[in-house]
């Protein structure tokens, strides 16, 4: 009788351990999927914002830019930037800190680029071309730094998710 009781308790303990392991595995998968979705949404929003900023820069390339067109494109850029901020909040919540640090590098690089483009827009409105060549080169340099920061974020996200295939 004692042997049967011990055997039953051992079986019950084993079943409980298996159930806990399954629940933990399910939680880990759920968390991974939420992080993947948050990271993908953020990167998609960053891409959309960058496309609208490229459109602003393209509109500013003309010797005499159409200011109405430039302003409309800037409005679209501002709307996309808001989308990026909303998506960033979820990444910050999902973490971990390595991804959040990489996200902040993207935020800083994007802000640096946007600052140059905003100055270019102000100069276009003032019909001031004295810094146009310098700012165009600076914007290209900052765009490259932003690209590097986004690459760093993708790498950090891949490390967290265990997806080495999305590093490049």
Language model segments and positions:
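Feature marks short, highly hydrophobic, charge-poor N-terminal signal-anchor/signal peptide-like helices
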Residues: 1-4
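Conserved non-transmembrane functional hotspots
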Residues: 13-168
């Amino acid at each position: 009788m004692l042997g049967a009781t011990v055997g039953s308790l051992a079986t019950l303990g084993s079943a409980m351990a298996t159930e806990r392991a399954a629940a933990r595995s399910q939680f880990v998968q759920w968390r991974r999927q939420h992080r993947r979705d948050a990271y993908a949404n953020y990167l998609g929003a960053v891409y959309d914002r960058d496309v609208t900023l490229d459109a602003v820069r393209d509109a500013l390339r003309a010797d005499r830019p159409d200011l109405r067109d430039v302003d409309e494109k800037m409005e679209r850029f501002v709307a996309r930037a808001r989308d990026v901020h909303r998506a960033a909040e979820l990444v910050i919540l999902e973490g971990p800190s390595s991804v959040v640090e990489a996200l902040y590098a993207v935020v800083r690089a994007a802000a640096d680029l946007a600052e140059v483009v905003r100055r270019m827009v102000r100069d276009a409105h003032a019909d001031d071309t004295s810094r146009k060549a310098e700012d165009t080169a600076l914007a290209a340099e900052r765009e490259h730094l932003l690209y590097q920061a986004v690459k760093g974020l993708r790498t950090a996200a891949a490390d967290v998710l265990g997806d080495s295939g999305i590093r490049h």
